[in-house]
Regions:
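Glycine-rich phosphate-binding loop of ATP-dependent small-molecule kinases
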Residues: 188, 192, 319-323, 331-503, ...
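Active-site cores that bind ATP or allylic diphosphates and position pyrophosphate for catalysis
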Residues: 2-398
Length: 581
C-alpha cells in the first residue's frame, strides 16, 4: 500500500495483490506456451481471472487449491485462516484434467479468441462433490437456484487449483474510463481526499428508491458514495449492463457534486444471498471502501419452485453482522424503500405509519409496462431513465420474436410456416426470415448426420441464427423437427433475453404423418433403410411448455397460421395498424 493511499481501509489480508508479471516474463511464457495444455476460459472464469489478477479477490493468488476450497465450503475460511465465503475454482473437463500433473504442469489460460491471459501453475486436481458444495454455499441444491444449478449441472466436473501469473487482464472495449481496478480506484480516492467510502452494489437499473437509499446511506455514515454495479455475469433475465450503465451515468447528477463516483465491477455473481453479501463487501474493501450497503434480500435469486424465497429478506444483514469484525468493512443496513403518495417522498418500509398510502412497482410490473408501452410514473423513476429503458425494451409489437415449430416429419410444420411467412410479408413492419428444417440442413448443416449429437448441433445453430434475428428486431420462423426437450429449452433460453419466443407444437399424430408420407421417408424407415428416424426408430419428446398446440389433422394450414397470429396478438407481439405505422 503506497503512502498516498495509506489512509484508506487496508485490503483484505493486508496487501493488495497484483498478479501481472514483468514484460520479459510475458515473452518467456508465450515462447513456452506451445508446450503447455491450453484452457479456453468460460464467461465466469474470465470474470474470476480478471479479479484475481487485479487484486479484487485479494488475498487470493490463484484458483483455489483443495485445502482452500474445503475450508471455504465448510467454514468460510481459507487454509490461512482468513475469512473468505465463496469458492473461486477453475472447473475443467475430465479429459483435460487427466492431462495434468500437480506440481509440474502449467496451463495456458486463454480467452475465447485464443489470446493468452495467464499461466496457472497446477498444484491440485480433484473431483469435487458439487452437490455438497451447492448445499454449503447456497443452502440449496434446487435447479431453480441459478447458483446451485450452475454448480451441480453446468460447471465442469473436475477442479484445478494453483497460483496464477498474469500476462494481461481480459480486454474490454466498452466504458473504459469506468473500468477501474482496485489500485486505480484507490488512487482516485486518495487524489480526491476520500477517506470514508460507502459502496452501493447493484445488478439492476437504479430508480428513485435506489438513489434515495444510496444518498441516505452516505449521509448517515458521513461518507462519499461509490456506485459499483456488476457488469459481469448476473441473474439470467437481468437488464443488459450497457443499458444499465447508461442509466447510472444519467443519475450521477442526482447526488451532491463531488460526493459520488461510478465504477464498473467485472464480477460473476453467484446469487448466494448471505454469503455473497460478505463476498461483495470484501471485494469493495479491496477497492478502498470502508462501508458497504446491504439492503433487502441482498444477492438473492428470488423464489423456489414452491414460491418460497431462498433466503429471508434480511438474512444477509444478520449474517453479515456476525462476521463484521473479520470482514473489516462496516455494514450500512437498509430496509426496502417505499413511496408515500401523500407526502411525495421515499422512506424505509419500517418507517411507514398506519394510514400512509404506499405505492410501489415491482421489477415484473416495470417490465410489463415497458412491454406494453404503458406509462411509467415519475414518482417511480426519472424520465431520462425511462427513455434509456425504452430503447432497450421497446413495446412488444416492436420487439423481435422467434416462432419455433416442433413436430414430426410430415406434420405440416413447413406448410404452416410458409403461410405464416406470407402473412407477415403481406402486412410488413418487421423483416421476416424463414429457417426451414430442410433448407437449414442443406445450407447450414450439410455436414451433419442424424445422431442425437448432430441433431442437437443443428437445432442450436438454428437457435443462434434466430437469436440474432430476434435481437435485431426481426421475426424468425423456425421449422425443424427439434425432437429433444432439453435442446428446445436451450434455444428458448438463448432467445428470450432478446425478445419473444413462441414454441408451436404441431401435434399431428404419427399415424396421420405416416399416411401422408409425401417424401416416402416413413416407408423407408419401416423398411429399415432410414436409421434414426424420429417417431419410428428415434424418440420424439413432446413439449410440455408449448405456447401453441396445433393438430393439422383437424385444421387447415391457413387456420393453423391464424391461430398462431391470434396468439401473437394476445401476447402483444402484433400491434394495431396505428401502432405498427
Amino acid at each position: 500500500m503506497t503512502a498516498s493511499t495509506s489512509h484508506l481501509v487496508a485490503p483484505h489480508g493486508g496487501k493488495l495483490i497484483d498478479l501481472i508479471v514483468p514484460t520479459e516474463k510475458i515473452s518467456e511464457f508465450k515462447a513456452h506456451s506451445k508446450e503447455w495444455p491450453s484452457w479456453d476460459l468460460t464467461a465466469r472464469q474470465l470474470c474470476d481471472l480478471e479479479l484475481l489478477i487485479t487484486g479484487g479477490f485479494s488475498p487470493l493468488r490463484g484458483f483455489m487449491t483443495r485445502a482452500d476450497y474445503d475450508g471455504v465450503c465448510h467454514n468460510m475460511r481459507l487454509a490461512s485462516g482468513v475469512l473468505w465465503p465463496m469458492p473461486i475454482t477453475l472447473d475443467v473437463t475430465e479429459e483435460f484434467a487427466k492431462k495434468l500433473t500437480p506440481g509440474t504442469s502449467k496451463i495456458a489460460l486463454r480467452d475465447p479468441e485464443g489470446v493468452m491471459l495467464a499461466v496457472l501453475h497446477v498444484e491440485d486436481v480433484w473431483q469435487p462433490d458439487r452437490k455438497a458444495e451447492a448445499k454449503a454455499v447456497f443452502a440449496s441444491t434446487s435447479a431453480a437456484h441459478p447458483g446451485a444449478d450452475y454448480a451441480i449441472n453446468k460447471a465442469n466436473p473436475w477442479y484445478v487449483g494453483g497460483k496464477i501469473e498474469g500476462m494481461q487482464i481480459p480486454p474490454h472495449y466498452d466504458f473504459r474510463n469506468l473500468r477501474l481496478t482496485p489500485a486505480e480506484l484507490r488512487a482516485e480516492f486518495a487524489r480526491e481526499g476520500w477517506r470514508r467510502v460507502v459502496a452501493f452494489q447493484t445488478r439492476n437499473p437504479m430508480h428513485r428508491a435506489h438513489v434515495e437509499l444510496a444518498f441516505r446511506a452516505a449521509k448517515q455514515v458521513e461518507a462519499n458514495l461509490l456506485i459499483h454495479p456488476v457488469v459481469g455475469m448476473t441473474k439470467p433475465g437481468d437488464v443488459d449492463y450497457y443499458t444499465r450503465v447508461r442509466c447510472y451515468q444519467l443519475l450521477l447528477s442526482k447526488f451532491p457534486q463531488s460526493t459520488a463516483k461510478l465504477s464498473l465491477l467485472p464480477l460473476a455473481m453467484r446469487m448466494a444471498g448471505p454469503r455473497e453479501a460478505i463476498w461483495h463487501a470484501i471485494i469493495r474493501k479491496n477497492h478502498g471502501c470502508s462501508h458497504f450497503i446491504v439492503g433487502r434480500d441482498h444477492a438473492g435469486p428470488g423464489k423456489d419452485t414452491d414460491g418460497r424465497p431462498f433466503y429471508g429478506p434480511y438474512e444477509a444483514q444478520e449474517f453479515f453482522k456476525k462476521h463484521e469484525a473479520d470482514i473489516g468493512v462496516t455494514m450500512v443496513p437498509f430496509n426496502m424503500m417505499v413511496y408515500l403518495e401523500d407526502q411525495d417522498k421515499y422512506v424505509p418500509d419500517d418507517e411507514v405509519k398506519n394510514g400512509d398510502r404506499v405505492l410501489n412497482i415491482s421489477g415484473t410490473e416495470l417490465r410489463q409496462r415497458l412491454n406494453e408501452g404503458r406509462e411509467i410514473p415519475a414518482w417511480f423513476t426519472y424520465p431520462e431513465v425511462v427513455s434509456e429503458l425504452r430503447k432497450s425494451f421497446p413495446a412488444r409489437h416492436k420487439q423481435g420474436v422467434t416462432i419455433f415449430f416442433t413436430g414430426l416429419s410430415g406434420s405440416g410444420k413447413s406448410t404452416i410456416a410458409n403461410v405464416l411467412l406470407t402473412k407477415f410479408l403481406e402486412t410488413g413492419g418487421r423483416p421476416v426470415t424463414l429457417l426451414d428444417g430442410d433448407l437449414v440442413r442443406k445450407h447450414l448443416s450439410s455436414e451433419l448426420g442424424f445422431s442425437k449429437e448432430h441433431r442437437d448441433i443443428n437445432i442450436r445453430r438454428i437457435g443462434y441464427v434466430a437469436s440474432e434475428i430476434t435481437k435485431n428486431g426481426g421475426i424468425a420462423i423456425c421449422a425443424p423437427i427439434a425432437p429433444y426437450d432439453a435442446t428446445r429449452k436451450h434455444v428458448r433460453h438463448m432467445i428470450e433475453p432478446y425478445g419473444g419466443f413462441i414454441l408451436v407444437h404441431i401435434a399431428t399424430t404419427v399415424e396421420v404423418c405416416e399416411q401422408r408420407d409425401r417424401k416416402g421417408l416413413y416407408a423407408k424407415a419401416r423398411a429399415g433403410i432410414l436409421k434414426e428416424f424420429t417417431g419410428i426408430s428415434d424418440p420424439y419428446e413432446a413439449p410440455s411448455d408449448a405456447d401453441v398446440v396445433i393438430n393439422t389433422g383437424e385444421l387447415s394450414a391457413e387456420e393453423a397460421a391464424q391461430e398462431i397470429i391470434l396468439h401473437l396478438e394476445r401476447e402483444g407481439f402484433i400491434g394495431t395498424t396505428a401502432e405498427s405505422a
